């Protein structure tokens, strides 16, 4: 799952879902992406700033698509999909300052970092 953080302030977005799963064996979200004041197109034309996990998730989706292009289309790893993509994204997640325990219930494994996700 994807949570949101404020990339300008390098802080957790308080509206973002957080916590342990019902079994208390997993922490969610898995990682976070920018989700505060994201510039996007507005209905009716023009641009606006939007906030929410609905604006954080496309960052992770785009990162996964680029990884799959690199692996599958360009022939670097023909089996780069699903859990393997998730594993690489989590492994490369960056930690925000001020948090001592990783993963944690606010930020999961950390913030999205596509650059460090590829092997």
Predicted regions and their residues:
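C-terminal domain-closing interface element
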Residues: 100-119
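Extracellular S/T/G-rich loop segment that most often corresponds to the catalytic His/Ser-adjacent loop
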Residues: 1-65, 116
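Glycine-centered flexibility motif
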Residues: 19, 75, 108-110
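Hydrolase catalytic cores
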Residues: 35-102
């Amino acid at each position: 799952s994807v949570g949101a953080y404020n990339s300008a302030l390098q802080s957790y977005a308080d509206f973002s879902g957080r916590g342990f799963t019902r079994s208390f064996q997993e922490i969610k979200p898995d990682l976070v992406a920018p989700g505060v004041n994201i510039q996007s197109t507005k209905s009716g034309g023009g641009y606006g700033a939007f906030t929410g996990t609905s604006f954080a998730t496309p960052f992770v989706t785009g990162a996964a698509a680029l990884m799959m292009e690199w692996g599958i289309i360009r022939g670097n790893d023909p089996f780069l999909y699903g859990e393997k993509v998730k594993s690489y994204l989590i492994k490369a997640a960056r930690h925000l300052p001020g948090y001592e325990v990783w993963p944690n219930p606010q930020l999961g494994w950390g913030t999205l970092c596509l650059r460090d996700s590829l092997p």
